[in-house]
From Swiss-Prot:
GO terms for molecular function: crossover junction DNA endonuclease activity; DNA binding; magnesium ion binding. InterPro entries: RNaseH-like_sf, RNaseH_sf, X-over_junc_endoDNase_Mg_BS, X-over_junc_endoDNase_RuvC. Mg(2+) 1 binds at D8, D139. Belongs to the RuvC family. The RuvA-RuvB-RuvC complex processes Holliday junction (HJ) DNA during genetic recombination and DNA repair. Endonuclease that resolves HJ intermediates. Cleaves cruciform DNA by making single-stranded nicks across the HJ at symmetrical positions within the homologous arms, yielding a 5'-phosphate and a 3'-hydroxyl group; requires a central core of homology in the junction. The consensus cleavage sequence is 5'-(A/T)TT(C/G)-3'. Cleavage occurs on the 3'-side of the TT dinucleotide at the point of strand exchange. Its main location: cytoplasm. This is Crossover junction endodeoxyribonuclease RuvC. It catalyses: Endonucleolytic cleavage at a junction such as a reciprocal single-stranded crossover between two homologous DNA duplexes (Holliday junction). Mg(2+) 2 binds at E67. The gene is ruvC. HAMAP family: RuvC (MF_00034). It holds the Pfam family RuvC. The active site is at D8, E67, D139. Keywords: Cytoplasm, DNA damage, DNA recombination, DNA repair, DNA-binding, Endonuclease, Hydrolase, Magnesium, Metal-binding, Nuclease.
Amino acid sequence: MTIILGIDPGSRVTGYGLIRQQGRQLTYVASGCIRTVVDDMPTRLKLIYAGVSEIITQFKPDFFAIEQVFMAKNPDSALKLGQARGVAIVAAVNQDLEVFEYAARQVKQTVVGTGAAEKAQVQHMVRSLLKLSANPQADAADALAIAITHCHLSQNVLRMSEGRLNLARGRLK
């Protein structure tokens, strides 16, 4: 049994989602958002670090997966996102977790089937895959999708290393 923590970083709202993987079975553990309502960036970063550290201490995940930075239209937004990612990653590394990073398009492709999926589609698929009674908050759903992506992609790598991955014309069968 493995617990995966997925993080959808943001300077104002950082989503988190935890799932349990047992073989191919995925089970919902917890999810939510770390909200930073203060204006100054150093305090926001401190709150994100403390929140992620607390989640890691409470749930003791085996793996930490986080969304990669994408090129935003506004360079200032991209820098703030990078800082939020940085403190979340430091929180994980300080507790000896290996960090895995996934691009947003890769997460959407894995969970929804298209890299151009809308947030509502991600929420719907996360709800369906984890058998939830309601759609999770958008940022929490993204974090759960990141954790799901880690499970699926790490399973494929494991199967490849064991020589059990079936490929036809370069695609998974």
